[in-house]
Regions:
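Short, surface-exposed loop or secondary-structure junction motifs
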Residues: 1-207
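A short catalytic or substrate-binding loop motif that flags glycine-/basic-rich loops and adjacent residues
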Residues: 192-194, 216-219
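Short, hydrophobic/aromatic-rich segments at coil-to-beta transitions
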Residues: 207-214
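Short, surface-exposed beta-strand/loop micro-motifs that present aromatic residues
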Residues: 221-226
Length: 226
């Protein structure tokens, strides 16, 4: 969960249509040799992170990550957020407007570099998010759909030791564990120094005196939890 598995992309060329096929993506990842020794460095797993974690959830619980998230987190919190949007909600989704420069690679851009390969397979565009196929699919690292209120409500769990509205959704121990640094150093994809806990970015340990974690996504979304 700290982008250190060495599987930030795949040697096999995957298309945008492939990202909608859960079994194909997880099978390709299972067959993929890590691009670096796992646990030795982070490298932003832009799309693959969701499949790696989601498959673990599926094998343990028997349901997809989208369904698990809905049943265990979104529904109890009445949070208007989906991983895999029902057709009935499509009319409520605003089209994503790509930034003028969508190149987020800050590291080595040589064609055979880890950074370049990560965004080559699978290669996606912000405009892909406007399609019905994208919205229906479960691509947990990239296609969660919600509004600002739902994002704030869900992340409030971490700020309150997993407790909200009279419910203990996540254990306090798990919340504290998320804030613990797991890996820190030069990220092999971003090309910037990064620190990661469990699933979230962290302020570098020597400066993180307030237990802050954060993450963001397309469309300018960002959550900072204190």
């Amino acid at each position: 969960m700290n982008h250190a598995a060495g599987l930030s992309g795949m040697d096999e060329m995957m298309t945008i249509e492939d990202t909608y096929d859960w079994d194909k993506m997880t099978r390709a990842l299972a067959e993929q040799a890590p691009w670096w020794e796992p646990g030795t460095a982070s490298g932003y797993h832009a799309l693959t992170q969701g499949y790696l974690i989601g498959e673990v959830v599926k094998r343990i619980t028997g349901v997809s990550l989208g369904r698990f998230f809905n049943e265990e987190i979104a529904s109890p919190l009445q949070a208007d957020f989906y991983i895999g949007v029902p057709d009935s909600e499509f009319s409520r989704i605003g089209d994503l407007v790509p930034p003028p420069n969508s190149d987020i690679i800050g590291g080595d851009t040589a064609i055979d570099s880890i950074a370049a390969k990560t965004f080559k397979s699978p290669s996606i565009s912000a405009l892909d998010s406007r399609t019905d196929a994208w919205r229906r699919a479960e691509i947990p690292a990239a296609n969660g759909h919600g509004n600002a209120r739902s994002v704030a409500k869900i992340h409030t769990l971490l700020a309150n030791d997993g407790y909200i509205n009279g419910q203990q959704i996540i254990s306090a121990e798990t919340c504290r564990s998320i804030m613990q640094p797991r890996i820190q150093g030069m990220d092999l994809v971003f090309g910037n120094p990064m620190a990661f806990g469990l699933g979230f970015g962290l302020i570098p340990a020597e400066k993180n005196t307030r237990n802050l974690c954060f993450w963001g996504g397309w469309g300018g979304s960002r959550a900072i939890i204190d």
